[in-house]
């Protein structure tokens, strides 16, 4: 699903990685250390959010997931950082962009979640609450269901939180995309978005990149 004028917010980047590299990523992920988190949107920088409050929106499934952080807080957090960072070099070539600052790389493995139904999504959030302008790439490691959602609200640093846990009746999806191995969604990271839990597949695995590109850096 898309709406008019969405191109300046988000775009699907199909098959931008060679198949051999796609398979190498899948093989590497099998040997990673994974860490359980009880809600998929949270990470240490989310101290700006009231993460203790229950999610009031009935569309939100507060599912758990497994994560692996490759880069955060200005430095590599994993021995696999350079391997996963190389994914962005293919994106740079495909879209003719230049990444000048890395903000975060996080892998997320989401299994099925009891009670999760069609039309639901995980917590709406932005990944970074301390940077005025940045891009996000959600790379799909495997084919799955559990669409990526982008919503009609942009983060306002004067009015946090980075996670929306209140009932937001005016919050509507302006873009959704179904996970396809080797492809991804590239978008303005200031827009609230949400991952998802699979229903028909055993798992949904993505690599989430947040970064600044040259044009943004020069502003």
List each model region and its residues:
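Catalytic core of non-heme Fe(II) oxygenases with the double-stranded beta-helix
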Residues: 77, 81-219
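Non-heme Fe(II)/2-oxoglutarate
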Residues: 2-98
């Amino acid at each position: 699903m898309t709406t008019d004028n969405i191109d300046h917010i988000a775009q699907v980047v199909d098959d931008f990685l060679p198949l051999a590299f796609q398979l190498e990523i899948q093989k590497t992920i099998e040997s990673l250390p994974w860490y359980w988190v009880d809600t998929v949107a949270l990470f240490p920088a989310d101290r700006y959010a009231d993460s203790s409050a229950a999610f009031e929106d009935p569309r939100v499934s507060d599912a758990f997931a497994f994560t692996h952080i490759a880069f955060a807080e200005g430095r590599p957090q994993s021995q696999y950082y350079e391997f996963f960072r190389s994914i962005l070099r293919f994106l740079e070539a495909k879209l003719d962009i230049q990444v000048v600052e890395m903000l975060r790389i996080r892998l997320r493995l989401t299994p099925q979640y009891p009670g999760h139904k069609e039309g639901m999504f995980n917590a709406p959030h932005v990944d970074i609450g301390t940077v005025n302008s940045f891009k996000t790439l959600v790379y799909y490691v495997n084919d799955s269901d559990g669409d990526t959602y982008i919503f009609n609200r942009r983060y306002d640093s004067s009015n946090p939180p980075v996670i929306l846990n209140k009932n937001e009746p005016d919050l509507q999806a302006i873009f959704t995309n179904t996970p396809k191995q080797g492809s991804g969604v590239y978008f303005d990271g200031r827009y609230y978005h949400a991952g998802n839990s699979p229903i028909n597949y055993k798992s949904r695995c993505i690599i989430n990149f947040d970064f600044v590109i040259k044009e943004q850096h020069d502003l």
